[in-house]
Amino acid sequence: MEYNTILNNTSKTRVCYFFDQDVGNYFYGPYHPMKPHRLCLTNNLVLNYGLHKKMHLYKARPADAEDMLKFHSEDYVDFLERVTPENINEWKDVKRFHIGEDCPVFPGLYDYCSIYSGGSIEGALKLNHRMYDIAINWSGGLHHARKDEASGFCYVNDIVLAILELLKFHARVLYIDIDVHHGDGVQEAFYLTDRVMTVSFHKFGGDFFPGTGDIDEIGAKTGKLYSVNVPLADGIDDKNYLNIFKPVIQGVMDYYRPSVIVLQCGADSLRFDRLGCFNLTIKGHAECVRFVKSFNIPTLVLGGGGYTVRNVARCWTYETSVCVDTEVNNELPYNDYIQFYSPDFQLIPDYTGLPFKYENANTKSYLESLRIKILENLRILQWAPSVQIQDVPPDIMPIDFDRDEDSKENMDKRKKKHNDFS
């Protein structure tokens, strides 16, 4: 009897999904918490659940130096393009680019950046041309990278590059970040403009990286009040998180009225993450995706942090099923990495009875004070900003419209061609 991985599907949402089979083969180092290999696990699960049949699969053109220069400095891009583990000692200004233990130089660094950035840029292009309702690139979402330096395991800020592309067609772009770390690189890039509203839900306080994202960071000049920060304490659970997430996002939608959304789904906000300190379940995390999706606004869905590899794969696979309106079986299908999911072999593990690593330090009164302050700031906006968009600049990447006429038969052929994700 064939194992039924899909329990229900009523999807009318047009979804495209970006994956390059090489992206999971890059290696930060033996003791580094960032493991691109998590992408291999994610995509193998997506395939074995049959979710690829509910969306169009793409291998994006890797971003080149010209693409990266839309945001990053020439010196920095040149450094990324030419530095290798073999020649790094020849560079006198490595510290200027913040290269070190957190952001090491590893074999294929530039190619890795090109691949994950290319998926985000091309996803933005397809949304711009109204080819899809949702574009997914789990390899993207590296939100800490700055204009001229690496930061927090991030080298090229694919999110900023994608938003710059979206701004060619959209007057207002909303960026939402549910990573446990503050989306500082994206906030900094758009801190002075009202055309991008950044909304970040994150741990704040003490020495927790990156140390930014207090509620009083609201933007400046034209961008004043267009940076929204929700600083949270350790141990927040699904109920408390959603009780602040939903009213804040509803308020943002009511007052800002974006025409496109970028959603960064960092999975380090999950319970038991290697570096995180929240207590979200996969279903709670995915409820944020479901809520954003309910507004029926074109959305670019990206990855981000996440350092307990098996849970990252579980989370992003489940959120892929949410994007394509498909209910999947909680029992994992057999896949190339099945041993990673021992001993339960469940998509959403049952943690009932297990002790919390972090107690919930978010009081009801504190969360309510955040909600009140943020909604007060949103009301000051009064109306959504508008701009006159004149001649639209050319796309960063050329669009091949013929690729979007793929039938289900062609999708199955593509699955066979790209079936090896190891």
Curated annotation (Swiss-Prot):
It is an enzyme of class 3 (hydrolase). Gene3D superfamilies: Histone deacetylase domain (3.40.800.20). Substrate binds at residues 102, 152, 307. The keyword Glycoprotein does not apply. One of its GO terms (cellular component) is cytoplasm. Pfam families: Hist_deacetyl. The active site is at residue 144. Residues 399-422 are annotated as: Disordered. It catalyses: N(6)-acetyl-L-lysyl-[histone] + H2O = L-lysyl-[histone] + acetate. GO terms for biological process: epigenetic regulation of gene expression; sporulation. Belongs to the histone deacetylase family. HD type 1 subfamily. This is Histone deacetylase B.
